[in-house]
C-alpha cells in the first residue's frame, strides 16, 4: 500500500508535552467501526469491558538509554549521541548513533563526558559494527549488572523526538514515562497506552471480574524511526525482544474458550501476542525477537480490542490501527479527535478500538 494513504494533518498544539494528572483522567475515544464515536475517560474502562474479558499489559521498564559521549580517535575528538536499541549480549547493545558520519568501526566512545560518571568513573565502548541509518553495535568495557548500573548513572530517559525537540528531559519524566507496573528492564521507549493506568484503576478492573495478564516486549528506538519508503512493502521493521510465558498463553487461550475477549493495552502487547499466535488462533509461549509489521489486510489471530494512544501520521503504528479498525474509520476517528481537542502521542489521550473483522480465528 502507498504510505501516503496513512498521512494526515496534525496541528502542533495537539501534541502533549506532559501527561494529565491523575493518569486515568486522560480522555478515551471509543471507536467501533460503523458506529458513532464515543467520548469517555480512561477511568471508564471497567464499564466498557465485560467480566471474563482479559487485559494484556506490557511490563517492560524503560531504561535511561540516551547516552552522550565523545568519540576518541588519535588527534580527533567529536561529540556523539547514542540511543540504545536492543541488547544482544551481556556487554553488547545495538544503538543508533548521531551524527553517524562521525563514527566508524573500531572507534572508541567515552560516555558521560558532560560531568556525569558511573561509579567506576567512565563508561567506554567500542564500535564493533556500523550499519545503515546510523545503527551500530556497541561493545562496552563493562558487562551484565555492572553495565546496567553504569547506564543508569550516565544515561537519560530517551523522550520521543516530538517531545525532546520542545523541552529537555527532567526528573518528572523518570516517573511519568514509566508504567506503574513496569518490572522487566530493557525498553528504550515506554508502552505508552499503559501510562494511563493507576493502582486504583487496576484494582477496579480486577473487582469487575476482568483478568490482567502481563507480557514483555522491550520497545526499541526503532519505534521512533520514520517510514522512508513510498510503499509499505518496502519498509523494514526493526526487531524487538519479547516473552510470553506458558502460564499467560494458557490463560489467554482459556479466555477465548469461554467466550471472553482479549484486550491488548498498547500496540506492543498486540504485536507480541499476534507473533505468539498460530494460524489456528492458539496463543503459544514465545521468547525471542519479533519484527512483525501489521498493515491493512492482516488477519488478526487473537486480539479482539486494542487500547492505544494517538499515533504519528505515516507511522507503522497508524498503519497497525488502520489494519485493526479500518483505514477509513481511523482517518475519521483521528479527524474527530483533532477537532474535539484530544491530545496526541506518548503523553496524550487514548482510544479503545474494536476490530473491524470479528472472525477471530481466521488468519
Swiss-Prot record:
The GO terms describing molecular function are: S-adenosylmethionine:tRNA ribosyltransferase-isomerase activity
Pathway(s) it belongs to:
tRNA modification; tRNA-queuosine biosynthesis
Compartments it resides in:
Cytoplasm
Can you supply one Gene Ontology CC term for this chain's record? Answer: cytoplasm
Keywords attached to this entry:
Cytoplasm, Queuosine biosynthesis, S-adenosyl-L-methionine, Transferase
Please classify the protein's predominant subcellular localization into one broad category: cytoplasm
Q: What does the record give as the reaction this protein catalyses?
A: 7-aminomethyl-7-carbaguanosine(34) in tRNA + S-adenosyl-L-methionine = epoxyqueuosine(34) in tRNA + adenine + L-methionine + 2 H(+)
Q: Which Pfam families match?
A: Queuosine_synth
Which example biological process does GO assign this protein?
queuosine biosynthetic process
Read off the InterPro entries from this record: QueA (IPR003699), QueA_dom1 (IPR042118), QueA_dom2 (IPR042119), QueA_sf (IPR036100)
Q: What are its E.C. numbers?
A: 2.4.99.17
Q: What residue ranges are annotated as transmembrane?
A: none
Subunit relationships: Monomer.
Database matches in PANTHER family: S-ADENOSYLMETHIONINE:TRNA RIBOSYLTRANSFERASE-ISOMERASE
* Biological role stated in the UniProt entry: Transfers and isomerizes the ribose moiety from AdoMet to the 7-aminomethyl group of 7-deazaguanine (preQ1-tRNA) to give epoxyqueuosine (oQ-tRNA).
Matching NCBIfam families = PRK00147.1 (NF001140), queA (TIGR00113)
- Annotated family: Belongs to the QueA family.
Q: What is this protein called?
A: S-adenosylmethionine:tRNA ribosyltransferase-isomerase
The record lists the organism as: Brucella canis (strain ATCC 23365 / NCTC 10854 / RM-666)
Which gene specifies this protein's sequence? queA
Amino acid at each position: 500500500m502507498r504510505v501516503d494513504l496513512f498521512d494526515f494533518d496534525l496541528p502542533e498544539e495537539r501534541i502533549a508535552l506532559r501527561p494529565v494528572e491523575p493518569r486515568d483522567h486522560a480522555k478515551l475515544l471509543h471507536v467501533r467501526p460503523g458506529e458513532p464515536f464515543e467520548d469517555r475517560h480512561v477511568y471508564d474502562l471497567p464499564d466498557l469491558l465485560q467480566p471474563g474479558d482479559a487485559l494484556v499489559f506490557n511490563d517492560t521498564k524503560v531504561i535511561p538509554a540516551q547516552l552522550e559521549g565523545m568519540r576518541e580517535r588519535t588527534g580527533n575528538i567529536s561529540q556523539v549521541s547514542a540511543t540504545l536499541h536492543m541488547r544482544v549480549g551481556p556487554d553488547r547493545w545495538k544503538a543508533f548513533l548521531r551524527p553517524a558520519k562521525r563514527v566508524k568501526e573500531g572507534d572508541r566512545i567515552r560516555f558521560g563526558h558532560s560531568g556525569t560518571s558511573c561509579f567506576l568513573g567512565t563508561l567506554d565502548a567500542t564500535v564493533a559494527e556500523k550499519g545503515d541509518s546510523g545503527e551500530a553495535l556497541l561493545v562496552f568495557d563493562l558487562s551484565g549488572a555492572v553495565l546496567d548500573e553504569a547506564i543508569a548513572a550516565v544515561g537519560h530517559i530517551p523522550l520521543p523526538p516530538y517531545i525532546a525537540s520542545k523541552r529537555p528531559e527532567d526528573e518528572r519524566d523518570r516517573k511519568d514515562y514509566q508504567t506503574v507496573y513496569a518490572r522487566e528492564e530493557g525498553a528504550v521507549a515506554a508502552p505508552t497506552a499503559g501510562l494511563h493506568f493507576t493502582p486504583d484503576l487496576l484494582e477496579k478492573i480486577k473487582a469487575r471480574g476482568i483478568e490482567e495478564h502481563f507480557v514483555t516486549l522491550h520497545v526499541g528506538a526503532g519505534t521512533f524511526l520514520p517510514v522512508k519508503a513510498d510503499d509499505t512493502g518496502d519498509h523494514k521493521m526493526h526487531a524487538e525482544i519479547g516473552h510470553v510465558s506458558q502460564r499467560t498463553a494458557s490463560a489467554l487461550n482459556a479466555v477465548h474458550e469461554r467466550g471472553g475477549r482479549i484486550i491488548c493495552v498498547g500496540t506492543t502487547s498486540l504485536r507480541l501476542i499476534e507473533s505468539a499466535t498460530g494460524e489456528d488462533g492458539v496463543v503459544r509461549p514465545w521468547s525471542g525477537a519479533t519484527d512483525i509489521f501489521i498493515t491493512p489486510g492482516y488477519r488478526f489471530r487473537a486480539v479482539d480490542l486494542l487500547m492505544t494512544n494517538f499515533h504519528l501520521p505515516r507511522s507503522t503504528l497508524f498503519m497497525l490501527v488502520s489494519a485493526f479498525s479500518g483505514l477509513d474509520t481511523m482517518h475519521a476517528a483521528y479527524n474527530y479527535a483533532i477537532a474535539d481537542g484530544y491530545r496526541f502521542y506518548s503523553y496524550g489521550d487514548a482510544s479503545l478500538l474494536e476490530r473491524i473483522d470479528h472472525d477471530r480465528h481466521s488468519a
